[in-house]
Each structure stands twice: as C-alpha cells, then as structure tokens.
C-alpha cells in the first residue's frame, strides 16, 4: 500500500463513517473531546464486527500528561492484553519520564502484554508510540527508543501544534526512521493539505479524525447543568464525516501515480 490513511474514532457511528469514506485502518479511543482515552472492550468488538477494518486501540488511562503512576501502568498493561484478546490489531500508547524522555522501562511490560496476547491468539500486533512523542525532550532520542522497543509506528505532528507547522521536523524524522519504522503524520491534517504534507515530509501515512459537530437529538434540554467540560455544550456531539474522509482518501490516491512515476524514473537511472 503506497499510502495509509488512519482515522481516529471514538464511536461505532464514526467508525462506520470512516469505513464508508475509505479509511485503511482505525485508531479507536473513547472521549476524543479530551484527546482520547482507552476504549471499552464492547466498543472495540462492535467496531471490529461492523467495519472489518484493522483497529489499533488507544491505551490512555486518563486525561492529562503522560507520566503515570504504578497503578495506572498496571491498568495499561492489563488493558493491552484484554484489548488484543478482544480483537485489536494494535495498541497505541506512550509514557514519559518526569524528565521528558520516553519511559522505556515503563513501556516494556505494556508492549510485552500486548505481544503475549497476540502470540496466544496466533496473530501479529502493531505497536504505536502516540503523541507523547510530541511533548518529549528529544525527538531523535525518542525515535531510537521506539526502535529499540520494536515499535512499528510513531504518531507525530513534528512536535508542533499541527503537522503543517511541524513539516520540517517531520521530514527529518521520516529520513531518520527509515523504511522499518512508520512515521504517521497527525494533527491538523485535512484533505486540502495532504498533498503538500506528503511532498514536504516524504511521509506515507496520515492520521485524522475528519470530525464534524452534530446537534443532539434531544428535544428537551435542561440548560445550566453541565455534566462534562466547562464551556462545552452537552448537546454538541463529535462524529467523523464520511465526506471528509472520502476527500482525504481521494487526495492520497491521486498521489499514487506520481509516486509510481518517480519510482520508474529512479529505476531507469
């Protein structure tokens, strides 16, 4: 597959929209409005059954930073095993030390739990380092830590608020990663900027949610009793827009002939 389009979803409705739009794979989480947390087993199993797409499940026990205590780390290892047993094709996680380095010692048992569960099931599992990478101290040291951990993917914006702003670092990361470690470009990715991002970075994998805000089906609405984030309406729901994903997939597909032409010219030389 010359290019990969991964869509981040937190509901079955969003997963189905991503599938209809042409997503190659899904990252599944809960609570995308706060950056995502670990999804339930029921949601994972439902999404797998309804879409048939490869699904990588997020491991994040809470909102906030990526420096976890021993109870949270134990939860993450247990969740890794259970999610893979329930059908997850991969796990997506990250842990940092207080000093801002990738916490290899903390991550090893989490990835080991996922791999052991996959081995018992007789299938492979993909392991991704998520955007904890974007707030680490040294991105190239973090890349080498990911390589040492045997990871397949790093999800990153190039340590910037959005991928277009991080394009220069993303290009360097793609070059440093080589063919065996996928740099998955995420944050601020749109159908409109995908071709330019691909050209500027050399990346082959892109991540977006493609979300829209839907109005709740509730007709009775008691205002002034917040149940979640202050300032965020209880009646505004995030959901992936199949049309956005379709345009993103089309943008990537349009690059394939250009890539093939470049490869043919290179071979002829």
Language model region names:
Residues 47, 53-107:
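Glycine/small-residue-rich loop that forms an oxyanion/phosphate-binding "nest" at active or ligand-binding sites
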Residues 3-7, 26-28, 55-59, 91-93, ...:
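Hydrophobic faces of well-ordered beta-strands that scaffold small-molecule active sites
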Residues 36-62, 104-129, 167-190, 232-255:
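Alpha-helix-loop-beta-strand connector modules within alpha/beta enzyme cores
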Residues 13, 32-51, 71, 97-115, ...:
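Active-site-adjacent beta->alpha loops and helix N-cap segments on the catalytic face
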Residues 13-15, 68-79, 137-148, 189-204, ...:
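Catalytic cores of alpha/beta
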Residues 27-36, 82, 86-98, 151-163, ...:
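Glycine-rich phosphate-binding active-site loops on the catalytic face of alpha/beta enzymes
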């Amino acid at each position: 597959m010359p290019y990969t389009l991964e869509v981040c979803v937190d509901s079955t409705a969003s997963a189905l929209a991503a599938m209809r739009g042409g997503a190659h794979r899904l990252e599944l989480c809960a609570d995308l409005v706060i950056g995502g947390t670990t999804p339930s087993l029921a949601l994972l199993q439902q999404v797998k059954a309804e879409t048939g797409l490869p699904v990588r499940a997020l491991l994040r026990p809470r909102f906030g930073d990526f420096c976890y205590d021993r109870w949270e780390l134990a939860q993450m290892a247990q969740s890794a095993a259970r999610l893979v047993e329930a059908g997850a094709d991969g796990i997506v996680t990250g842990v940092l030390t207080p000093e801002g380095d990738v916490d290899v010692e903390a991550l090893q048992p989490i990835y080991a739990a996922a791999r052991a569960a996959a081995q018992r099931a007789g299938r492979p599992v993909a392991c991704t380092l998520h955007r904890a990478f974007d707030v680490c101290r040294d991105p190239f040291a973090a890349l080498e830590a990911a390589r040492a951990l045997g990871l397949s993917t790093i999800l990153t914006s190039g340590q910037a608020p959005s991928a277009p702003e991080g394009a220069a670092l993303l290009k360097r990361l793609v070059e440093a990663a080589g063919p065996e470690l996928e740099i998955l470009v995420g944050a601020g990715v749109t159908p409109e900027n995908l071709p330019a991002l691909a050209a500027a970075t050399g990346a082959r994998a892109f991540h977006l949610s493609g979300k829209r805000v839907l109005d709740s089906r509730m007709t009775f609405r008691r205002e002034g009793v917040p149940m979640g984030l202050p300032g965020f309406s209880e009646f505004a729901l995030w959901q992936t827009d199949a049309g956005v994903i379709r345009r993103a997939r089309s943008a990537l597909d349009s690059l394939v002939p250009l890539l093939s032409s470049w490869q043919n010219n290179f071979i002829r030389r």
